[in-house]
Structure formats: structure tokens, C-alpha cells
Amino acid sequence: MSWQTYVDEHLMCEIDGQHLTAAAIIGHEGGIWAQSDSFPQVKPEQTAAIMRDFAEPGSLAPTGLFLGDGKYMVIQGEPGAVIRGKKGSGGVTIKKTNMALIVGIYDEPMTPGQCNMVVERLGDYLYDQGF
């Protein structure tokens, strides 16, 4: 299965009648493995800052989490495993696996819990597969 298939069928899938606004799988070094059409252009320094927060939880809190031109307020996640952010009526969930970052961006009416479930379910699966 291609990485794009994981994005299209597992991240952008419908859940309770809702779906993510955008999603991507990004390598730890910043390379985009696959993304939805609507995913923002992420800069290398933004990926580096996200990876730093996984290594040093809390490092993003003072500045916020940036994805492309979007800025998210960092909210409670799981140190070293999941980063969550909020922006207006939407937000982002980022799950770290052995080799990649699974990123899901949502807006209302999708809920944070639905986004978390979609992103973390795929992230857990890929982690268990060694990715």
C-alpha cells in the first residue's frame, strides 16, 4: 500500500459523517511522504520544531505550533508521542511513529476527539509495523 493510500483511505476517511480538513505523513527529517490536496506547505524549520517538542515536551508551548501559515495553540497531548493544537473552531493532532509524523487538521463540525481517534489509530498501526 502506498503512503498516499494511507492518507486518502485512513486519514481522510469519513467518521460519523465528518472528515479531516487536511492530513499528511511527514518523515522525521521533514520530507513529505504523502499529503491531502489541502495540506499546508510545511517549512523544514516547522518540522524541526515539532520534532524538538517530542524530544523536549513543552518547547512549542511559548511560541505555538506552526504548520504553513497556520498557528496553533499547543494543548495537552501525550509527551513524546502526541502533540495537539487548537486554532479557532479547529485544531491539529500529530502522532509520532518510529519514522514519521502522522498529521491531521480538522475544523468544526469534526470534534477534537474524532481527529485524535483517526490520527492516533493510524499512528499506532504504523508504529506497530515498525514505521
From Swiss-Prot:
UniProt key word Chaperone: no
Subcellular location: Cytoplasm, Cytoskeleton
Keyword set includes Cytoplasm: yes
SUPFAM superfamilies from the UniProt entry: Profilin (actin-binding protein)
A Pfam family this chain is assigned to: Profilin
PROSITE patterns: PROFILIN
Keyword field: Actin-binding, Cytoplasm, Cytoskeleton
Molecular functions per Gene Ontology: actin monomer binding
Family annotation (InterPro entries): PFN, PFN_euk, PFN_sf, Profilin_CS
This protein's GO CC annotations: cell cortex; cytoskeleton
PANTHER family: PROFILIN (PTHR11604), PROFILIN-2 (PTHR11604:SF49)
Subunit structure: Occurs in many kinds of cells as a complex with monomeric actin in a 1:1 ratio.
Role summary: Binds to actin and affects the structure of the cytoskeleton. At high concentrations, profilin prevents the polymerization of actin, whereas it enhances it at low concentrations. By binding to PIP2, it inhibits the formation of IP3 and DG.
Family statement drawn from the similarity comment of this UniProt entry: Belongs to the profilin family.
Official protein name in the record: Profilin-3
UniProt organism field: Lilium longiflorum
